[in-house]
Amino acid sequence: MKTKLMITIFSCLLLWSMLLLLSFSNIFKHQLLGATINVGSKDSVKPRDRLLGGLLTADFDEDSCLSRYQSSLYRKPSPYRTSEYLISKLRNYEMLHKRCGPGTDAYKRATEKLGHDHENVGDSSDGECKYIVWVAVYGLGNRILTLASVFLYALLTERIILVDQRKDISDLFCEPFPGTSWLLPLDFPLMGQIDSFNREYSHCYGTMLKNHTINSTTIPSHLYLHLLHDYRDQDKMFFCQKDQSLVDKVPWLVVKSNLYFIPSLWLNPSFQTELIKLFPQKDTVFYHLARYLFHPTNQVWGMVTRSYNAYLSRADEILGIQVRVFSRQTKYFQHVMDQIVACTQREKLLPEFAAQEEAQVTNTSNPSKLKAVLVTSLNPEYSNNLKKMYWEHPTTTGDIVEVYQPSRERFQQTDKKLHDQKALAEMYLLSLTDKLVTSALSTFGYVAQGLGGLKPWILYTPKKFKSPNPPCGRVISMEPCFLTPPVHGCEAKKGINTAKIVPFVRHCEDLRHYGLKLVDDTKNEL
């Protein structure tokens, strides 16, 4: 009897222990899940909008591309609303791409017409698909900006965008359109030729205009658009309204570009009304397009989340500093270091250094905050020196400053898979910061600010190896800069300032007398 009682008591204790353990396990799991979901949201525990206000479709398998639906977990709720018109336009485009994309009968018919220039290809029947092929050139920042530009043009003209997959595009980004692919098939008829396309190519639009070999009755099966920094006046005519009516008839366009040419699309009257409906807030174009198009692959996303959770998630505030020095010498420059410190302290982005005797007073007056500084640069010396400064000196505010640099590559290695993946991860990490400092004229910085919806402080270009005064200034628009736009209007050879045609296209802060960018606040003068 006594033994039976002991067994009963032991069984009850064992059952109670198991229930208690299960309870603790569920609590821990819930807390871990909560920590994952609320990462990056220090001021809010609101549920995240995984579809970004309808910008994204729910028609994807989440595991195949974790970043697509998880990115909102790492961002504060967006203050920039997506227009219903843009959402509708994207859903319609997705259906069009599914009907006309690789592997479809429509794609097969379209490729069969390539090379038949003497046939009247411009008179194709309604419903035939038209295409624009994006060829990867220059660095990753340039590629992302041009890909967004080409996609917007495709959206406006109802063309199918296909991207050159021979570089590392599929190692960087997930497919953006459900049920189809945006990768240009490797057996594309012109694949063996497109690398040699240049300004002198017989089917280059600028060359055909120059030689008078294209008009409304002689429509070629394809055109090459040379929209690189060295393009000629004839190449720039692509942006003009009259020329668009001609280009629109060509079934296949192949484009090489290293420019964010979206501002010039806004200057075209035939596109302007549609663009205003798509983007009522005019300085959010790249922001919305980038969040729709560019979803890092799982490998890249792993780099992002591991870095964020390990080094940034616990901070009260995150500051991003992107350092790009345009010099033949890929080395550390002291004047750039001085400029970084001057900018961040002058603009109150980082605390100033205090004398040792002040530190004791400061540290007891207010609770200290943790500021995480994410530095991206090919050189490690900038982050090393910043870290050393804030380790050796107390701050006037008592704040703790931690400095972190994910990679230290020393020199650019475009088209090397791991290098480009690290670069993309760093762009994305910069976009997750609360405040951002970027280098003038850097497409790397443009991508980060646009993706994050941030208006950064730009480090002005140094002159004669001296830190400029002021060292930096804040931009009025998060849009990237069109660095080498047409310098005059379509209807005049000269005398037209393209930054004064419409109030929402202005000169860039980092290229005041030449570059163009979209702005939304028309009260600011540059």
UniProtKB/Swiss-Prot annotation:
One of its GO terms (biological process) is cell wall biogenesis. Residues 1-4 are cytoplasmic. One of its GO terms (cellular component) is Golgi cisterna membrane. Glycans are attached at residues 211, 215, 363. GO terms for molecular function: galactoside 2-alpha-L-fucosyltransferase activity. Its main location: Golgi. It is a single-pass type II membrane protein. It is found in: Golgi apparatus, Golgi stack membrane. Residues 26-526 are lumenal. Belongs to the glycosyltransferase 37 family. May be involved in cell wall biosynthesis. May act as a fucosyltransferase. This is Probable fucosyltransferase 7.
